[in-house]
Amino acid sequence: MTEDKTKRSDNIEMRCADASVKCYSYEEALDLTGHGKYNIGLLFACFMVIIAMGIDIFGLGIIVTAATCDLGLNLQQIGILSSMPFAGIIVMSYPWGYLSDTRGRRLVLMWAMTGSFISAVLSSLAPSWQVLAALRFISSALSSAAESATYALLGECCNSRSRARYMLLMTSALMLTPTLYYVWGYFITKLNFSIYIMGILYRPWRLLTLVMALPLGIGAILLWFFNESPKFLANVGRMEEAVDVLRRMHEVNKGKTEIYPVQGIYLEEGSKEEVGQLTLRSLWLQIAPLFKPPLLGRTLLLYYLTFVIYIANNSFAIILPTIFNVFFTSYANLGPNSGSFCDLFYVASETPAPITNTTIIEPVIPECTDTISENTILAGCAHGLSFFVLNALLSQCAGRRKILTIVILVIAAIAAVLINVTGEAISGLVLFYVFLTTAMVFGIVSSYFVTLYPTSYRGMVACIGMMVARLSAFTGTNVVSAAITTTCAPTFYGTAALVISGAVAAWFLPSDSTEIN
């Protein structure tokens, strides 16, 4: 024990060579910066980056649907296009984690969002579906850096009192994205113009693609006004820069009249991560500690929770416009006596309608049209806005993350079981909405990636978590889209069992007061 104290003292001495300078731990120094304009501004910038990523990845369904006529897409080609964002995320999750931990959160975000913006803008001029697919793959691969690096950047610049609440507020950004791209899609595709430019026919779907790319550029510009994470700087040995950033945060938050007392800091774990080249060996050195004691248990637990909530939620959320369209179309045709929620999908499976696992505009369309169904828009907006508000309200309970996770998952599992049991379609739709509240757990799990891991591993563990999430969503989407019209009820029962297992796993999460610096 004495030896440990000596080693700890030596680490502090090494980081504060000047004996006349009082050293503060990073968390103490961060608390002294206060909470104010800098934190709120950074929250807004990161919020915009997350919105941009969500629109870039999840808004592609609207674009693909509107472009079907111009690009002459068949169902197989639509499926390939719709899968491009997930392919991009899966390929780049690992490298982004490494770069975030070794090159810097802000630097990675600025380059990634700028590159994604350029690729997304170019995709609006794609002459063929193959070029569109390639550019959207690049765009999503780059924008996917946002999901891990933004949480790390924001979490390391907020004091312990506001950190968990900010993490949950960040999830609200993803809840807001469907409303944005549904509304943009609705109004822009109502326009009627065709302009030949640079050898292509410029129609509304191309304008929509351009508009949906703008948040990527705006996010990159906003990040320019903020500094790198001071904790990252301290972790790689750039202590003076870290203190300078903390001093600037204090100045922005409290003004120039109050002097910032911190002149030296140290990281409590006394670790220093060397910045190396991006090689397979360096990547392995980053990931290996996550699957060894003492991190192994929490890594497996959090990755299982990630698997459960994403396969349960995104498997349905990604094809949500299709689900809404099938529901409202079948219900309009059959009326109140249409049977249960699942009965509507059984009826739809027997009707020769062009229903696929991507966004559907109209049930039967004799000719090409870019117009988006109003029922799909209204349902999508209601879902996005209500979840945004709900998540913002739940962020006020950030101090009770563990119990919140368990309660949400249990309620969602019960709703999934009852969806078809009620025997009535509208109540089934309401319960389906309740089931989708599993999305509220996204931010909670992300906050655990920040609080339960040392600084040098946070970017990597979050990025691998994102890879687990997207692989789960990709697999689940294909399973659900194939099963919901033939084995709808068993699909929900199986999902309910999976969600319950997630609630049981959440019971083993550490207490909310546990945090690793």
Which role fits each region the language model picked out?
Residues S83, M170, T257-I259, P336-N337:
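Sparse recognition of residues in long alpha-helices and their boundaries
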Residues T2-V236, E241-R247, E269-T329, N357-T358, ...:
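Transmembrane-helix signature of 12-pass secondary carriers
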